[in-house]
């Protein structure tokens, strides 16, 4: 009897239709008592994320969601907060939503949010 190699199995599977392949997967699941469902892996990944959320956040991102009516004032505040050049600050404001500051303390994030909001921008701290 000729021995079947992995390459032979792969070649055989490549020639199967999607319907036949789906039926084969179901039969294999029943025969070996396993599941090919991906949500199990997703649930395992979500676990640590929940634990991290429970810890107190120490670094915040200031996100410019929209420039509002007074775009020039917002550009000036962005330049002051980030020390970007005029063109870079304008591109950041035009490309909203964009992070203005990342990984800053809560106090610094709140101060930046206050300044941007006073200039007419829509801001979010994450």
Swiss-Prot record:
Domain of life: Bacteria
Renumbered residue ranges of the record's region Disordered: 97-126
Coiled-coil parts of chain: none
InterPro entries in the record: Ribosomal_bL12, Ribosomal_bL12_C, Ribosomal_bL12_C/ClpS-like, Ribosomal_bL12_oligo, Ribosomal_bL12_oligo_N_sf
UniProt GO molecular function: mRNA binding; structural constituent of ribosome
GO BP annotations listed: translation
Keywords of the record: Ribonucleoprotein, Ribosomal protein
Pfam families the record matches: Ribosomal_L12 (PF00542), Ribosomal_L12_N (PF16320)
A GO cellular component entry from the record: cytosolic large ribosomal subunit
Basic and acidic residues bias spans: 104-116
HAMAP family with a match to the protein in the record: Ribosomal_bL12
Physiological role: Forms part of the ribosomal stalk which helps the ribosome interact with GTP-bound translation factors. Is thus essential for accurate translation.
Quaternary state and interactors: Homodimer. Part of the ribosomal stalk of the 50S ribosomal subunit. Forms a multimeric L10(L12)X complex, where L10 forms an elongated spine to which 2 to 4 L12 dimers bind in a sequential fashion. Binds GTP-bound translation factors.
Annotated family: Belongs to the bacterial ribosomal protein bL12 family.
NCBIfam families, alphabetized: L12 (TIGR00855)
PANTHER family: 39S RIBOSOMAL PROTEIN L12 (PTHR45987), LARGE RIBOSOMAL SUBUNIT PROTEIN BL12M (PTHR45987:SF4)
Protein's UniProt name: Large ribosomal subunit protein bL12
UniProt lineage: Bacteria, Pseudomonadati, Thermodesulfobacteriota, Desulfuromonadia, Geobacterales
